[in-house]
Regions:
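N-terminal binding-site loop/beta-alpha segment at the start of enzyme catalytic domains
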Residues: 2-116
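Short, compositionally biased strand/turn segments
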Residues: 25-30, 128-135
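A short, structured active-site edge motif that brings together acidic residues
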Residues: 114-128, 155-158
Length: 158
């Protein structure tokens, strides 16, 4: 990296000051800032699927059928998910890789299914930790059983 002389310092300082001076004007020109609530129900793209604007993830640092959420134990996981649901976050993001299906099942079992949006993910490759059921349809069927639900709203390839 080259040296930074006095002339370069002054140029950079003047450019920075100019940017700071014009920033408020640029922000006003952009229009009002939209305020959103994470619990707002919105359409997921053009799918017709209704989800809360925010989703509760269940797989931070997920691997080998566990995640930071599930490794904290059932009571902590339940508190986290119930808090999100109490706040109106009804979109739940899971994956076989995270081992979260049984944890989620226990929390949602008495909730109206039409008030939830469930997303899970299939791992596309064979690996020692994959519980392969034979194919995508079989995987989704297994996920539905693990969750105690008749359908998933969204299923992704992880």
């Amino acid at each position: 990296m080259g040296s930074f002389n006095r002339r370069d310092f002054l140029k950079a300082s003047i450019a920075g000051a100019g940017l700071l001076a014009t920033a408020p004007r640029l922000l006003r020109a952009a229009g009002p800032v939209a305020h959103f609530n994470g619990a707002d129900i919105v359409e997921l793209g053009k799918t017709g699927i209704k989800v809360s604007r925010l989703a509760q993830g269940t797989g931070f640092n997920g691997y080998n059928h566990s995640s930071e959420h599930t490794r904290q134990g059932k009571a902590a996981f339940d508190r986290l998910l119930r808090h999100s649901l109490d706040e109106g976050i009804s979109f739940i993001d899971m994956a076989d890789l995270y081992g979260s299906h049984p944890f989620v099942k226990d929390v949602i079992k008495d909730l109206p299914r039409n008030k939830l949006s469930l997303l899970s993910k299939i791992w596309p490759e064979n690996a020692s930790w994959v519980k392969s059921s034979g194919g995508a349809k079989e995987e989704v069927d297994r996920f539905r059983k693990e969750l105690g639900t008749d359908h998933l709203d969204v299923c992704l390839i992880h």
